[in-house]
Amino acid sequence: MVKKIYFSVIQNHNVIKKVINSLKLAKTIELVLHDPTKDFFYLSEMPHSLKNADLIVVKVRNECSIDLLHFAKLYNLPTLHDVDTVLLCKNKIALDYSLRKIFEKYKDTLEKFLMPRSWNQSLADVSKFKEWALPKLPIVIKSHFQHDKYNRFNFLVQKIDDVDIFCKRYKQFLSYDVYIQQFIECDGLEIKIYVIGDKVFGIKRENPIYIYLRDKPENIDVSTIEREKFEVTEEIKNFSKILSTELNLKIFGFDMVCPLDTDKFSIVDLNDFPSFRGIPNVEKDLKEYIENYALNL
């Protein structure tokens, strides 16, 4: 039996390109590709290839990606991740709420893991924000939403004058609420955990914030940071399984750091369908999971 997969994704790096090429060669799959930055719709006549798909897989890039998932929900079309799951991952505040609820529910199981202090705030009144932020420094200001790379930022505030730099650099965002995390002093490394079904992978790389603190570059291309394998522990595998179940995620990743004053891990970010850069031959696992998921529907 041949299953039709409607795959909405930008072919912008080798992992995705290899997954697509492998799915094209699979005798059990008919693959329809959609680029959310180029392929748009006549809304009263959505394509049959979408309506008749056995599975819709979306690697979210922009609002067009979200629109597809809304359409799928309205017409009860099968998706790898549904719109509610993706919207939760997109919204850092809602995701924070959900993660804290998970930590509370599994507090006896997740003793090895922490969440940093966090807040939502506004910089519409900069003086008021500075007064609020001063006793909490250092902090990291993050964009409220995370799927659109043109509207996404992580900004370290060590001293209160750094707020002025943020306001100058991101002045178009001052009327929006932002997500703020306590800055976690760590060993300078960032651990990235990737999950595909019941398979869990790990890499470690230099933390971009620590690169900035050391070198003060104008920009940091995180894709060029060297990555090494990280041995995934049973505690991390169990944590991954809990996140998958509670957040209804099949393919996802999360970032952790190791605070200097404890042997625990602090989770600082989570994404649906991440890049998987640095995992050898991961395209094989992704292809097999997506293919098998479609065949088992």
Identify the role of each PLM range.
Residues 10-121:
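Conserved N-proximal alpha/beta basic substrate-recognition cap immediately N-terminal to
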Residues 139, 179, 201, 252, ...:
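Protein kinase-like catalytic core scaffold
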Residues 152-244:
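Phosphate-binding site of ATP-dependent enzymes
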Residues 8, 86-178:
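Active-site nucleotide/adenylate-binding loops and adjacent lid/helix of ATP-dependent enzymes
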Residues 61-63, 144-146, 273:
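Short glycine-rich anion-binding loops that position phosphate/pyrophosphate groups of nucleotides
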